From Swiss-Prot:
InterPro entries: Aldolase_TIM, His_biosynth, HisF, IGPS_HisA/HisF, RibuloseP-bd_barrel
Annotated protein name in UniProt: Imidazole glycerol phosphate synthase subunit HisF
Pfam families: His_biosynth
Enzyme class: lyase
SUPFAM superfamilies with a match to the protein in the record: Ribulose-phoshate binding barrel
Role according to the record: IGPS catalyzes the conversion of PRFAR and glutamine to IGP, AICAR and glutamate. The HisF subunit catalyzes the cyclization activity that produces IGP and AICAR from PRFAR using the ammonia provided by the HisH subunit.
Organism: Enterobacter sp. (strain 638)
Gene: hisF
Length: 258
């Protein structure tokens, strides 16, 4: 059995790490490199960096900090932000990233997933999915350009359909960003995770809602996710990664201890 992964998420805007609630009202957390170094030292299994306004601004992630992060950590990390071509991806990987993640650009050009997977291998290609539960329709819908609330829009895709589509096109991993739960620390949306797990054959990462160690346990035990991503509980030092992993191990979760 593969070990479950604990993944701190660092949302980047204007060269700094920020954090919002339900993808809105972002506050500055701190500088990118020191936070990355801290999480690696605490025992994170990997890191994910999202340049949250790159796609909506029509630009690619700032590669200068990617190289600086690669110099100070010895764990895998994934970078997302405005990657629209194999050339964009190649540059980010050449600066030291282990994976690249695409989200809004994949919705605009689904064939991009296949082009990237063919060139770099599926193990390198992560697709992020920003999913919102609509009370009016009772369905989960995929959103686009969520890094800028003034430009965020609901797409024509229902979440389960898009999950299946990106797998067909070559996604090697899926990060499910559950927008309703983001930043509120009330737990992951287990119902949605179970539905997605039923149709997801590639590694699946839960994102949005972690507030306690028990929330991580529930995601692993009840929804069988491969990794749990979180931000505010780590940024604000509500949960220590080493202590979290020790707790999960005592609960029978296969985890890499620090």
């Amino acid at each position: 059995m593969l070990a479950k992964r604990i993944i701190p998420c660092l949302d980047v805007r204007d060269g700094q790490v920020v954090k919002g609630v339900q993808f809105r009202n972002h506050e500055i957390i701190g500088d990118i490199v020191p936070l990355a170094k801290r999480y690696a030292e605490e025992g994170a299994d990997e890191l994910v960096f999202y340049d949250i306004t790159a796609s909506s601004d029509g630009r690619v992630v700032d590669k200068s900090w990617v190289a600086r992060v690669a110099e100070v950590i010895d764990i895998p990390f994934c970078v997302a932000g405005g990657i629209k071509s194999a050339e964009d991806a190649a540059k980010i990987l050449s600066f030291g990233a282990d994976k690249i993640s695409i989200n809004s650009p994949a919705l605009a050009d689904p064939e991009l997933i296949t082009r990237l997977a063919d060139r770099f291998g599926v193990q390198c290609i992560v697709v992020g999915i920003d999913t919102w539960f609509d009370d009016a329709t009772g369905k989960y819908h995929v959103n686009q350009y969520t890094g800028d609330e003034s430009r965020t829009r609901v797409t024509q895709w229902e979440t389960l359909d898009w999950v299946q589509e990106v797998q067909k096109r070559g996604a090697g991993e899926i990060v499910l960003n559950m927008m309703n739960q983001d930043g509120v620390r009330n737990g992951y949306d287990l119902e949605q995770l179970k539905k997605v797990r039923a149709v997801c054959r590639v590694p699946m990462i839960a994102s949005g809602g972690a507030g306690t160690m028990e929330h991580f346990l529930e995601a692993f035990r009840d929804a069988d996710v491969d990794g749990a991503l979180a931000a505010s509980v780590f940024h604000k030092q509500i949960i220590n990664i080493g202590e979290l992993k020790t707790y999960l191990a005592t609960q029978g979760v296969e985890i890499r201890l620090c």
